[in-house]
Design a protein with these regions (language model features):
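Long, low-complexity intrinsically disordered regions
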Residues: 64-80
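Basic/aromatic-rich interaction segments and small domains that mediate binding to polyanionic partners
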Residues: 2-65
Length: 80
């Protein structure tokens, strides 16, 4: 079960936002339907890349034995 403030992992690429499968975000809101979430993705310095409405099929919980990985954010049009 995914809850507010959980760390989650993106299940597939979202090219329009420069996000790739495996990127890590934080759940900032859970909708009442239990399967839709607002997820914030940030840079290592804390700058918000995107806050997106995603379904339970777009994200998964981060597991205790997983480790974070760093990569450069791709340039995208229309995304600051």
């Amino acid at each position: 079960m995914i809850r507010e403030l959980d760390t989650v992992v993106l299940a597939h690429d979202l090219e329009a936002y420069g996000l790739t499968q495996g990127d890590v975000g934080a759940v900032v809101h859970c909708y009442k339907d239990g399967g839709t979430f607002e997820v914030e993705f940030v840079t290592g310095e804390g700058t918000t890349i995107a806050v997106l409405t995603l379904s339970q099929h777009d994200i998964r919980p981060m597991y205790a034995r997983e480790i974070l990985h760093v990569r450069a954010l791709a340039e995208t049009e229309g995304v600051d």
